[in-house]
Curated annotation (Swiss-Prot):
The keyword Transmembrane applies. SUPFAM superfamilies: Ammonium transporter. One of its GO terms (cellular component) is plasma membrane. InterPro entries: Ammonium/urea_transptr, Ammonium_transpt, Ammonium_transpt_CS, NH4_transpt_AmtB-like_dom. This is Ammonium transporter 1 member 1. Ammonium transporter probably involved in ammonium uptake from the soil. The chain crosses the membrane at residues 39-59, 74-94, 120-140, 148-168, 192-212, 236-256, 274-296, 307-327, 331-351, 360-380, 411-431. It comes from Oryza sativa subsp. japonica (Rice). NCBIfam families: amt. The keyword Transmembrane applies. It is found in: Membrane. Induction: By ammonium or glutamine supply in roots.
Length: 498
């Protein structure tokens, strides 16, 4: 949405030149203000996903580790803010730079400037901490707190920003928005909101963390058979899932970063606002179909209607559609969600056979479904939407008649993300293990980190009247199966006195 004095002069006459300049400047200011408000609101929605991650993680672990996993989610956001401010944003979007890594804006120096204002930093920080939150789920219930500090800072300050520079910056070697050199296969990578940049990065990092640490005590029996260590609260899992669903409407539609932009002749549907709405619809359909497919797929597999499996299936659909949400039709999003559900089910079965333990299925969900989403986009991206967002003459989906160039670029993306994260996070986790800084002791793991590392339990119930009568201040929930009730504690206390 833009105008200029030359556009208005024929209407107002030559004597109105100053007036037209003034009006055009006001139009430009209004457009910038609306776009900034849209981006800030999207950033707030994406940040709200941290609450969803916290609730999802808390419900997926045993009660004795609840405080630990929630503290790591707070740490991801807080440490991520500092290190993304100091280094991460510069590595990701510092321009001018080379195709590999940015080299401006350290500590937000020289900000704001055209194209890079503080709202954009906040939006990108919310994405960076989402990747770190994914990884924390893979290594839950057995990782030392200092290891979280180290990996979170490294991931948000260096590993993730480099990948986002490749794919999203104007200088990145694989970016579809590249302005400083040739596009990869004449196309660049269309990873609109980060199936690869966010979800694969977090998932592959979690894969290496979980592999190097090994499974939790009791996860597999002496014969190698899988033993379910179920999370303690399906209610928290559902709450976290809905919060993440809500936040995804900032994650995917918000990745347009602006809303007042026209695509052609003036008209209600010829603008970016229509693309924003379509992106919200494709996101909704992919997640919903993935949830339903998982519901019936797991019912056939296990004989149960499992709400936790459905929630994970839903999130897998969201992770998959994130790459192509803006460039595919709603009917294609249904295919994306359907396939992503089976990708997750299959990878979970493979993980059990390989004795791979990921308490939140993060590597399978975000890594596996994210990779599928990258391939899906290369198959189903529609020419009209690609050209509206990225420019005319771009390759589009193979199944839509666009040839194989986009698919080739996306295969390269999957390979380089897996290789980069493996070469950076793998040695980091291995080094932490050799230094004795990665895994907690068997005694601490058995007792639970809330008690041994955080000074108490997550769930404490106090009843003042009961306390006055019995001298016992309530109960602490020690695990999903074991807790001390006030009445039982009072009876025990009376017996001891006798």
């Amino acid at each position: 949405m833009a105008t200029c004095a030359a556009d208005l002069a024929p209407l107002l006459g030559p004597v109105a030149a100053n007036a037209t300049d003034y009006l055009c400047n006001r139009f430009a200011d209004t457009t910038s203000a609306v776009d900034a408000t849209y981006l800030l609101f999207s950033a707030y929605l994406v940040f709200a996903m941290q609450l969803g991650f916290a609730m999802l993680c808390a419900g997926s672990v045993r009660a004795k580790n609840t405080m630990n996993i929630m503290l790591t989610n707070v740490l991801d956001a807080a440490a991520g803010a500092l290190f993304y401010y100091l280094f991460g944003f510069a590595f990701a979007f510092g321009t001018p730079s080379n195709g590999f890594i940015g080299k401006q804006f350290f500590g937000l120096k020289h900000m704001p400037q055209t194209g890079f204002d503080y709202d954009f930093f906040l939006f990108q920080w919310a994405f960076a901490i989402a990747a770190a939150g994914i990884t924390s789920g893979s290594i839950a219930e057995r990782t030392q707190f200092v290891a979280y500090l180290i990996y979170s800072a490294f991931l948000t300050g260096f590993v993730y920003p480099v990948v986002s520079h490749w794919i999203w910056s104007a200088d990145g070697w694989a970016s579809a928005s590249r302005t400083s050199g040739p596009l990869l296969f004449g196309s660049g990578v269309i990873d609109f909101a980060g199936s690869g940049v966010v979800h694969m990065v977090g998932g592959v990092a979690g894969l290496w963390g979980a592999l190097i640490e090994g499974p939790r005590i009791g996860r597999f029996d002496h014969a190698g058979r899988s033993v379910a260590l179920k999370g303690h609260s399906a209610s928290l899992v559902v709450l976290g899932t809905f919060l993440l669903w809500f936040g995804w409407y900032g994650f995917n539609p918000g990745s347009f970063t602006t809303i007042l932009k026209t695509y052609g002749p003036a008209g209600g549907i010829n603008g970016q606002w229509s693309g924003v709405g379509r992106t919200a619809v494709t996101t909704t359909l992919a997640g919903s179909v993935a949830a339903l497919t998982t519901l019936f797929g797991k019912r056939l597999q296990t004989g149960h209607w499992n709400v936790v499996d459905v929630c994970n299936g839903l999130l897998g659909g969201f992770a998959a559609i994130t790459a192509g949400c803006s460039v595919v039709d709603p009917w294609a999003a249904i295919i994306c969600g359907f396939v992503s559900a089976w990708v997750l089910i299959g990878l979970n079965a493979l993980a059990a056979r390989l004795k791979f333990d990921d308490p939140l299925e993060a590597a399978q969900l975000h890594g596996g479904c994210g990779a599928w989403g990258i391939l899906f986009t290369a198959l189903f991206a529609r020419q009209k939407y690609v050209e509206e967002i990225y420019g005319a003459g771009r390759p589009y989906g193979l199944f839509m008649g666009g040839g194989g160039k986009l698919l080739a670029a996306h295969v390269i993306q999957i390979l380089v993300i897996f290789g980069w994260v493996s070469c950076t996070m793998g040695p980091l986790f291995y080094g932490l293990k050799k230094l004795g800084l990665l895994r907690i002791s068997a005694e601490d793991e058995t007792s639970g980190m809330d008690l041994t590392r955080h000074g108490g339990f997550a769930y404490v119930y106090h009843d003042e009247d009961e306390h006055d009568k019995s001298g016992v201040g309530g109960f602490m929930l020690r695990s999903a199966q074991t807790r001390v009730e006030p009445a039982a504690a009072a009876a025990s206390n009376s017996n001891n006195q006798v």
